[in-house]
Amino acid sequence: MSDPAVPRRPTLDLRSFTPARVALGRSGASVPTRALLDFTLDHARARDAVHAVFDVPRLLADLGALGLAVTEARSRAADRRDYLRRPDLGRQLDAGSIEALARIASRPCQLAIVIGDGLSAAAVHAHAVALVTRLLPLLAADDAVALGHVVVASGARVALGDQIGAILGARMVVTLIGERPGLSAPDSLGAYLTFAPTPGRTDAERNCVSNIHHAGLSNDEAAFKIAWLLREGLAREVTGVALKDESADRAPRRIGTSLPE
């Protein structure tokens, strides 16, 4: 009699194409012990990612070493418990951060970058600085994009970047933020681009480059897509459903033009 805990390998083994839980086999009415233990471990890693401490000093130092003007901000979420129970507070800056950002907003800029912990500080620690490092040369190429401040924001939801971008007078804000951890990817980073950021923007007015992690979209690929969308968005003065990623087919339009060259 064959062992029911060991799945028979089909002609096309889907497990070689995806980390998803497929073809696990069975043991009686349940899955094999190994599969159950793997599930429990991945679930624990996802929970740990949500509650991980956000290492702001390390990020400020690493980004400052790249020659960037970096500052710190906080949302109105007082702690992690507050953040998880009140998503609305993660979209609003606290009073001290509003004052601090207003003091450094000397003149408008084309781009502000916000790096927020989101639902996975682990993702930000693993990928944010490396992604910014690869993005900077792409911003400096050709008609360079003028980068203003980089803001490291604690207790951040995606929409917090709208308020930050508005205070800094940025035409575009790119928010790099930890995505909700999955059972196969607890350290996935997302990048959200919003033209003319201001409080009240909807998700339909943003572009997202997601699934940035070692087993997903690489930092090089993500930086290329972000730079393309950023330049195209600035040229057309739009982001969201009206802006599609065509980076694989053509170069972005020159900023200040409305038609392809």
UniProtKB/Swiss-Prot annotation:
Listed GO biological process terms: amino acid metabolic process; ethanolamine catabolic process
EC number: 4.3.1.7
Annotated residues for binding of adenosylcob(III)alamin: 158, 179, 208
GO cellular component: ethanolamine ammonia-lyase complex; ethanolamine degradation polyhedral organelle
A Pfam family the protein falls into: EutC
InterPro entries, alphabetized: EutC, EutC_C, EutC_N
UniProt entry tagged with the keyword ATP-binding: no
Keywords: Bacterial microcompartment, Cobalamin, Cobalt, Lyase
Pathway annotation: Amine and polyamine degradation; ethanolamine degradation
Family affiliation: Belongs to the EutC family.
Subunit structure: The basic unit is a heterodimer which dimerizes to form tetramers. The heterotetramers trimerize; 6 large subunits form a core ring with 6 small subunits projecting outwards.
Name of the protein in its database record: Ethanolamine ammonia-lyase small subunit
Organism from which the protein derives: Bradyrhizobium diazoefficiens (strain JCM 10833 / BCRC 13528 / IAM 13628 / NBRC 14792 / USDA 110)
Taxonomic path: Bacteria, Pseudomonadati, Pseudomonadota, Alphaproteobacteria, Hyphomicrobiales
